[in-house]
UniProtKB/Swiss-Prot annotation:
Lineage of the species this protein comes from: Eukaryota, Viridiplantae, Streptophyta, Embryophyta, Tracheophyta
Catalysed transformations (reactions): L-methionyl-[protein] + [thioredoxin]-disulfide + H2O = L-methionyl-(R)-S-oxide-[protein] + [thioredoxin]-dithiol
Taxonomy, superkingdom: Eukaryota
S-S bridge residues: 76-129
Role noted for this protein: Catalyzes the reduction of methionine sulfoxide (MetSO) to methionine in proteins. Plays a protective role against oxidative stress by restoring activity to proteins that have been inactivated by methionine oxidation. MSRB family specifically reduces the MetSO R-enantiomer.
Protein name from the UniProt record: Peptide methionine sulfoxide reductase B7
Obligatory cofactor(s): Zn(2+)
Enzyme class: oxidoreductase
């Protein structure tokens, strides 16, 4: 499925499937993270150290989530972004208020967490800590 542009983000929650349908289209690791709110192993993700120009999309539904221009090396062991494409993610506070869960606004797939106020020299001082397995990447020169 081709990645969607920010202007083409479908309505929130509009891409729903039953677990058996998700299992048929996702790898076991993608299902564990996206649907069961799992976490990649620290430092092992495909996109942790990737800084090529392009767009990161949801591995579940193809919705464009992050531009590479918002990616930075936080040293946390997971891909880190300081901002998402407008309307592409949902943020839900977790108990204790230290972090917010982030999910795809279209398919509700678990992406990771947002941490605020950690002192990064980024425009937002936010760290969107995202599981690599939740993402697909399209380089700026590709047709997707």
């Amino acid at each position: 499925m081709a990645a969607m542009t920010a202007a083409a983000v479908p309505a929130t929650g509009s891409f729903q499937k039953q677990d058996e349908e998700w299992r048929a289209v996702l790898s076991p690791e993608q299902f564990r993270v996206l649907r069961l709110k799992g976490t990649d192993k620290r430092g092992k993700g495909e996109f942790t150290k990737k800084f090529e120009e392009g767009t990161y999309s949801c591995a579940g539904c193809g919705t464009a989530l992050y531009k590479s221009t918002t990616k930075f090396d936080s040293g946390c062991g997971w891909p880190a972004f300081f901002d998402a494409i407008p309307g592409a993610i949902k943020q839900t506070p977790e108990a204790g208020g230290r972090r917010m869960e982030i999910t795809c606004a279209v398919c509700d797939g678990h992406l990771g967490h947002v941490f605020k106020g950690e002192g990064y020299s980024t425009p937002t001082d936010q760290r969107h800590c995202v599981n690599s397995v939740s993402l697909k990447f399209s380089s700026a020169g590709s047709s997707q």
